[in-house]
Amino acid sequence: MKVSRHTKILEIINLKDIETQEELAEELRRSGMEVTQATVSRDIKELKLIKVLSSKGRYKYATISPTESFLSNKLVTIFAQTVLNVDRVNNMVVVKTISGSANAAAEAIDSLNLDGIAGSIAGDNTIFILSRSEETAFNIVQKLKKMINE
């Protein structure tokens, strides 16, 4: 069941610009599959789908190439090895790294395509991430801390 659902998801996102999990769930239902938004969310994670800018200027789900996946995994490893601390101040996330590593760690964060990030800036050993809300900042901190096993 899961394999056929994953295959159908990949087929759908290659044929249509799917912007939300709910849209994807609706397309799956139209093809005769009973799914919940939670199931679709898990499938998106397992398939490592990302959101990319479509030709219409809107974000849609897409797959990443094996090269991008390999590079992304390398960056996540660098992130885990160089980050010392992750903290939140209101809607801003502050990431402290070992000296000279902030740019590489910021590249890793960018490769994650996390929702709700308005922008980021990296210095020598500090990254500032501006999120769209305090709740989003909290969620980003949780995800980043999980990556460094904190």
Swiss-Prot record:
Keyword Chloroplast assigned: no
Pathway: Amino-acid biosynthesis; L-arginine biosynthesis [regulation]
SS bonds (residue pairs): none
GO CC annotation terms, alphabetical: cytoplasm
Keyword Metal-binding: no
Domain of life of the source: Bacteria
Protein role: Regulates arginine biosynthesis genes.
Family: Belongs to the ArgR family.
Protein name: Arginine repressor
Originating species: Clostridium acetobutylicum (strain ATCC 824 / DSM 792 / JCM 1419 / IAM 19013 / LMG 5710 / NBRC 13948 / NRRL B-527 / VKM B-1787 / 2291 / W)
